[in-house]
Structures are given as C-alpha cells and as structure tokens.
C-alpha cells in the first residue's frame, strides 16, 4: 500500500498505469549510428557488386587434382598450380597489353574459334541458298586471319624487311631459310680458303635460326581447302540439279541425286533421242496407244454396267422403304409414349428401392431396441432383487434396534 502522505499531491494520475519516461532512445534505435566516411586519399574505395561477382564466379572451381603444396625436404619438386605458355590480362585492370601479349591472345582466340568452327561444320548442314555467315565462309576468313598472324610472327623472327607471301607463309619461310643457308655456306667456303689467325674473331654475319613447327596450321589449312572443295561441289550440284516436276518427264529421277548420277541419267535420256531409237519408240508407243484405247472402251462399258446395277439396287431399296415410311409416324409416337412410361417405371423403381432401404433401417433399429430393452429388463430385475435384499437387511436391523 502506498504511503498516505503522497495521496493528495497535485499532478498525480489516479487509476492509471505507471509510466516511467526517459530521454534515451528505444533499444532497437540505440544501435543505429552513422558510420564515419573516410575522406583520406590514401584509402582506395572499391565498389563491389555481390550479385555481379556471384554471377561471374558461378559454377567455377579450381582444379586441385594432382596438386601438392606441402613443404619439400627432398630434391623432388612438388606440383602446384601450373601456368600456360603465356598469361592473358584480366578485364578492367587498366594495364596496356604489350605487342607480344596481344599476339599471343589473338592466336589463342583464333585457335579456339577454329575448334568451334570444326565442331559446327560436323553438326550443321550448310545450305547453298543461305546468305548468312556459313561455317565454310567463316573457315575461309579464319584461314586468312591465321595467315596474317603467322606473317606478322615471321616478320618478327626474320626482321621487318622480310618479304613473306601471305598465301603460303610456310613455303615462303622455307625458301628464305634455304637462301640464307646457301649464303652462309658460300661465306663459309670463302672464309676457309684464306689464312686465318687464332686471334681473328668469329664472323658476325652468321645467323642462328630457330625452327618452329605448327601442325595445327597445316591441319587448319587442309580443313579449309576441303571445306572450299565441298562448297564448290555443292554449288555445282545445286546448279546442275533441277526441281522435281510431276508434269515434266525429263526431270524424273533427278531430285536428290548427286552430280555423277545426274550426268548418267542425262546421258541415258539423250541417248534415247537418237533417230534409230526414236522409230522403235514410236512403234512401241503406237501399240501401247491402241491397247490404252481398248482398255478405255472396256472400262467405260464396265463402268456403265456397274452404274446400272447400283441404280437397280437403289430402286429396290426405295421399294422396300415405302411401306416402312408410311408407318414411321405411328412408330415414333409409340416410342415417345413408351419413353414416358419407362421414365415413370424408373421413378417407381427408385421409390421402391428407397422404401426397401428405409424398411431395412427400421428393422435394424427395432432389433437394436429389442436388445436394449432386454438388457434394461435384466438390469431392473437385478436392481429390484438388490433393493429387496437391502430392505430386508434394514428391517432386521430395525427389529434388532427395537429390541
């Protein structure tokens, strides 16, 4: 109970809950504070987009199969991450590529594009009527690009004044090497004819060559030549081949045939147009025409007989249908009446079924009630016998108490 000295003080709210006010913020808002922004120029601010970073590295894994980063005590070298022949710069680094890195990147991309084109050529059937960039045209352009890259590489090896034939860079390189070897042999022969001292320095005009084999270039050139040959054969077949026309007997059998089959068919048809053969063909055609006329006459007579038989059958059917058509309205009326009778019979059958079901339910209920009544009677008899025994005991006790 509160102290009575505070009962009559002014400003006290009576019959209301106690409220304790404070100037502090709620607990949920106390943790909120503004982070101090770093304005120093020594701190690099990097804006990271988590969604873009996740999409970039999604489904990417570092292959650790066969790698060993443990410390080594023996002389055997552990296998770590191996790098390729060169390293391509990443995107957005702001570092300018050197000519060597740019050449290596272009060569790598051309090789990847060549592999993809080879896969496309095996799966996609080229069309002679398409005007878009087909795999064959793309292979030609790739061959030209690869030859340009090879040419630039050879110029770097042999010097800026090297005259390289872009159509055959490998042959031009071989010829130039042979010329240089011949010049070296000649200079060597002239030097050995005179007397040389032991202090004479070696000839500085000698050239050291490094031979680089490029089997992928030969394979690519061969594939490009085969693709060009296939394209020319396809264009030639499309030019010689004609469309299938049912009305033109000369074009029969030419659709879908290759160039050799088409030429053989055309030679056979041209041979059939010889004068000696035409007389025989005309005689055969006359005999065939006579047989065709006989067949047409016989067919007309057969068709007339067939038509007459069908007309007779139709007339007999109409004769049989006439008496049935007269009695048809009465039959329809009778069917309508029988339909109503069938509907009433169906309703009556449903009522009988419902009545039978209700009767069975009542019989079951009566049977259950009879069973319950028997149980009640048995229970009442037992209770009456028990009550009579209790009253007898009470009478005996009363008599004993009265004595």
Swiss-Prot record:
Membrane topology (UniProt): Peripheral membrane protein
Gene Ontology CC entries for this record: centrosome; cytoplasm; dynactin complex; dynein complex; membrane; microtubule; vesicle
Membrane found in the keyword field: yes
Residue ranges that the Swiss-Prot or TrEMBL entry lists as coiled coil: 100-130, 216-248
Modified residues (Phosphoserine): 83, 322
Subunit structure: Subunit of dynactin, a multiprotein complex part of a tripartite complex with dynein and a adapter, such as BICDL1, BICD2 or HOOK3. The dynactin complex is built around ACTR1A/ACTB filament and consists of an actin-related filament composed of a shoulder domain, a pointed end and a barbed end. Its length is defined by its flexible shoulder domain. The soulder is composed of 2 DCTN1 subunits, 4 DCTN2 and 2 DCTN3. The 4 DCNT2 (via N-terminus) bind the ACTR1A filament and act as molecular rulers to determine the length.
Name of the protein this chain belongs to: Dynactin subunit 2
């Amino acid at each position: 109970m509160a102290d009575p000295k505070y009962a009559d003080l002014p400003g006290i709210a009576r019959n209301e809950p106690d409220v304790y006010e404070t100037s502090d913020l709620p607990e949920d808002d106390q943790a909120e504070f503004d982070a101090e922004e770093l304005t120093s120029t020594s701190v690099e601010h990097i804006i990271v987009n988590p969604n873009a970073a996740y999409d970039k590295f999604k489904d990417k894994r570092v292959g650790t199969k066969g790698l060993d980063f443990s410390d080594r005590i023996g002389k055997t070298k552990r296998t770590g991450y191996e790098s390729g022949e060169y390293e391509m710069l990443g995107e957005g680094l702001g570092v300018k590529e050197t000519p060597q890195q740019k050449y290596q990147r272009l060569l790598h991309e051309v090789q990847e594009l060549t592999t993809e084109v080879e896969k496309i050529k095996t799966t996609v059937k080229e069309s002679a009527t398409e005007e878009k960039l087909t795999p064959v045209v793309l292979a030609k352009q790739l061959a030209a690009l690869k030859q340009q890259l090879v040419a630039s590489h050879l110029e770097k090896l042999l010097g800026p004044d090297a005259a390289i034939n872009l159509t055959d860079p490998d042959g031009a390189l071989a010829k130039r090497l042979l010329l240089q070897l011949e010049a070296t042999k000649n200079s060597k022969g002239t030097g050995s004819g005179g007397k040389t001292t032991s202090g004479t320095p070696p000839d500085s005009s000698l050239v050291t060559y490094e031979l680089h084999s490029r089997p992928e270039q030969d394979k690519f050139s061969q594939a490009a030549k085969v693709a060009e040959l296939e394209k020319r054969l396809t264009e030639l077949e499309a030019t010689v081949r004609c469309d299938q026309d049912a009305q033109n007997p000369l074009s029969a059998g030419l659709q879908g045939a290759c160039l050799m089959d088409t030429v053989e068919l055309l030679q056979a048809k041209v041979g059939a147009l010889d004068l000696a053969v035409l007389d025989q063909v005309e005689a055969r055609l006359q005999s065939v025409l006579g047989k065709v006329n006989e067949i047409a006459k016989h067919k007309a007579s057969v068709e007339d007989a067939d038509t007459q038989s069908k007309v007779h059958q139709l007339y007999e059917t109409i004769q049989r249908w006439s008496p049935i058509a007269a009695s048809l309205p009465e039959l329809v009326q009778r069917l309508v009446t029988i339909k109503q009778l069938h509907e009433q019979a169906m309703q009556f059958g449903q009522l009988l079924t419902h009545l039978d079901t209700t009767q069975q339910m009542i019989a079951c209920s009566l049977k259950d009630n009879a069973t319950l009544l028997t149980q009640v009677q048995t229970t009442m008899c037992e209770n009456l016998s028990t009550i009579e025994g209790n009253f007898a005991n009470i009478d005996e006790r009363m008599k004993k108490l009265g004595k």
